Structure formats: C-alpha cells, structure tokens
C-alpha cells in the first residue's frame, strides 16, 4: 500500500473513532446507539454487516444490534460459549479472522444476508468486547472484496479492538452507576431482615427485642472482639455466650467457662493463670490455667463484676498484653483467646463506688449485648413454657401437655428469676401432674409455694437477694433500697408493691412466706397477676423491754417521697409502709451478711431484740 494511501486510511480511522465516541455519548438508548455505530463503520470504512452481540446472565451471546436486520429478526439469534466463530471469540477472548466465509466450516451463517455476493468474497473480522478485563460481548464485521481474500487484516483488528473497547465502557457504565444503588438496597433489605435471624442453640424467642439480640449475635460472632453480656440472673447469658462461640471461626476450639463469683481471689488467680509445682501448699504438680486451656478458643468470664479490684489489675494486664505468668512461675506464656464477659451488676455504678476499675471496664466493654428480662418479652413466655414441657417429657420418657388456662396464669407472672425461674416452675408443675396434663392447680401459685412476691418486693426496693439482681434496665441498678431507715429516698424511687394476703391455713399452722391467692387466676396483681384482697398483711409487734423513763412521743409519719425519714431510733417497727416486721428483719439480715449486730443498727433495734425476733419467727441463721 503506497504511503499516501496508508496515511489517508489512518486519518479516516481516526475520524471514525471520533465519530463513534460522539455517537456512544449522545444517547442512553444502547440498542439505537450501537446501530448508529455500525452504520458509521459501514459508511466511513466499508465495514459491512456489522453485528454486536452481548452476553446475558445465562452466559449466552445475543444479537442486540445489526446492519440490515430488523429488531425482531435480531432478537432470535444467539450463540452459546464456543458455538461457531462468534462463540469461539467469546470463549477464547481473542480476535478471529476468516479470510473466506464460503470455505469456513465453523461459519454457521445464522444472520444470513450474504447470498447476493455473486463472485465477491466475504471475509469476517471479529473481536471481543471487554469491560474491566471481562468479555461482555463480540463485535463482527464483513469485508467484501472483488479480488479474492485479502492477505492482511491486522489494521482492521486493531481498529475494531479500539471500537470494541469504547462499546465495552458504554455497556458497563449503567451497571457502574447502579452498583451503589444496588448496594444500598441490599444493605437496606439485610437490615430489615436482621431481626428475623434464625434461632440459635436452645434460645427460644419470638419477641422483637430478643430477635434483635439474635441478630446482634449473628453480627458479632465472626469477629474476635470482646463481648460484654449484661442482664439479670436467669436471662440466659451463658447460652448467648456459647452461641457466639459456636457461630465463630473458633467453634472447633475450646469454650472455657469460669464463674468469677464462685471462687475466692487466691483460687481464682490459680484457676485463670495456672500455677507451678510447689507454688503453694498442695501444689504438687504444674497446673494449666483457663487462659492457657482456652488458647485458640473462647474464655467466658461469668459474673466478672464480682472480682476484687486487686485482681482486676492482674486481669487487665492479661487482656492488654495477651500474656501472663503462672502463679509461682516466671515464664511468660502467650495466649490467644476471645473474651466474653457477663454480669448482672451495674458496672458504671460500681466504678463510681470504687469497686470496679474504669480501665478494665473500657477494655471489656467493646461490644455490649443487653438481654431483656422475661417480663419485658412476654411474647416468649408461651414458646418457652412449651419448650420446657417438651424437654421435661423427653428427659423423663413421658407424654406431657399444658392447658391453655395454665399458660395464661404463667403469662401474668412477673418472673423475677426470669427464664431459669420459668423452667423450674414448669418442672415443679410437671412433677405435680397426675395424668400428663399441667393444669392451673399444678402450678406453684395454687400450692402456696410461689416465692416470687417476696423476691419482687426486695427487687423493687433495689436489694440484691441471694444473688438475684435488682430490677435493672440497660444500665441502671439501684443497690440501696429507697426509703429504708436512716437513708433518704430519692424523689422518683419506686414503691414496693403491697404483699399479697396469706391464704388462710388451719389453726396452728404457720407459713414462712406470703403466698399467692387463687392460683394467680383471678386478675392482675403486682407480682403474679392474681387478684388480691384489700386486706393488709397482719403486723406482729415486737415486745420491747419496759423503758426506764417515759419515751418521747413519736413524730407523725411523713411521706418518704416528700420529706426525709425520722431518725432510725424513732422509726416505729410496725410502720405499715415498711412491710411486716419479719420481712424487714429478713431484709436487714440479708443486707448485713447475717450479722445480728449490724442488722440491729440498721433497724434501730438492740442486738437482743433482733435475736429474740429471729427465734420468734423461726428464721434460721445463715452461716458463711
């Protein structure tokens, strides 16, 4: 080819590229735009019968634009991967040249239109259309020659490759623009579906707040982040901790549990960090600690709020450095554990009182999961009750069902002991059923064995009874019972519900606990939902020794919310708002660790009076 002709062709190709780029940017109608591009190729460079095929979601090439074919005819033409010359280009991602279509056995001629060539020779040039390195289609054109097949198609391949690249970018642009929208829509749908998380392990729940907890467990499980589980006793903190471990990449490694409240400080250090032989009396061999045993897995520290401030400093160092020494040893041991902590205490309040280190709090409070008490997820009482009934029946090889009336009674209870108390209640009722049916009369309320009212009274006052956490929200636990003698009550302090009247008993019989009336079946009450008679609990005054001098007149009672209470020595023991004497005595003994002298000071009594009252009400002294 003479130099002048070569220069002219190059200029024409450059002009055509310019026209193609203008066409591709002129309209959002892809099919119409591609037809205009093919017409420009035919008009400028005599590249006839242009075809543009695009890959569908099923990986099939479909004809979307063609010179000389109607849209209806083009819609019927498709090629699969490796089928014909066009399919080969898709499969290999490489250009293809057929000098003479009439002699090519792979040519399928599905588009037709070449029957009127007479003595002319048709050659085909095809190139892949790529976007971001991926083949998304094929561009083909025909070269018609009167002088036989051409010998060189290199310039056509290079030119068509540039055109195909422009087409590929045009095809990809709408998808690129839609990706953020699709991602946002996907995120929105996932967020809406999060509360509908699949149940895990033995966690039975249908209430929205527990479903959100399940979704939170699914989100946090894949990571190594420390988790702090907060909730009242009996809400299932260990169950959630095990679920997080079982759904994590560490599920095949150990899950080690330590109850920090059950071990004294000296023993807790040995249990967590281990000890060397001879470290102390009785250490006859080396002992691996829980941090060492849990390496590669999960360590669950239950009741972490009960460890002493001195030990908290040692624990903080391990959590920060992921290394420790055994008791009596000097070798530093590296560990790789995921830490999950749980508590039913108000750690923020404990920090304010100097009982919990703030730096340890910030170390463990990375991801917090709040477990709602059972009274705040009443939708779960029915499913949980049926689950425990089925579990008891399976464990004991029997058939057991529960009446709807009994379930209604359970739905009206307050459950200060949460799910654990519900399970125990179901088990008690199951043992009382005679024919495999749990009826209303099988429940503890009907048998005067329900202690929830007493526990609820102390919990409402803010006291911790036997390890049962006071009523707490996401972060509020009142450890000081409002309105107790000698302590002013806050203005918004909750008032303890009235104790239900005891069920009449035969003469001579004594009930150590106030009981629910009517089996909790008549109507709502502060505790179990039972209607209670409007009769105050009988108060038995405590006999006091004769005073040596006339006592001053007691001041008139005042409201605990409007004025400060009188001095402890002047508080009458049978004050109606203070509850029965027996209840106040139990409260004081629990508060003071069953030390009579301290309880006496708390109640404004003498030690002798407290001792007499304990004997009178048959209250057994707890020994620790």
Curated annotation (Swiss-Prot):
Query: Which Gene Ontology molecular function entries are recorded, alphabetically?
Result: ATP binding; ATP hydrolysis activity; DNA-binding transcription factor activity; metal ion binding; sequence-specific DNA binding
What GO biological process terms are annotated to this protein in UniProt?
nitrogen fixation; phosphorelay signal transduction system
Extract the Gene3D superfamilies matched here: 1.10.8.60, 3.30.450.40, Homeodomain-like (1.10.10.60), P-loop containing nucleotide triphosphate hydrolases (3.40.50.300)
- Per UniProt, residues of the GAF domain are 29-171
Stretches for region Disordered: 477-508, 549-578
Query: What does it do?
Result: Required for activation of most nif operons, which are directly involved in nitrogen fixation.
Q: What is this protein called?
A: Nif-specific regulatory protein
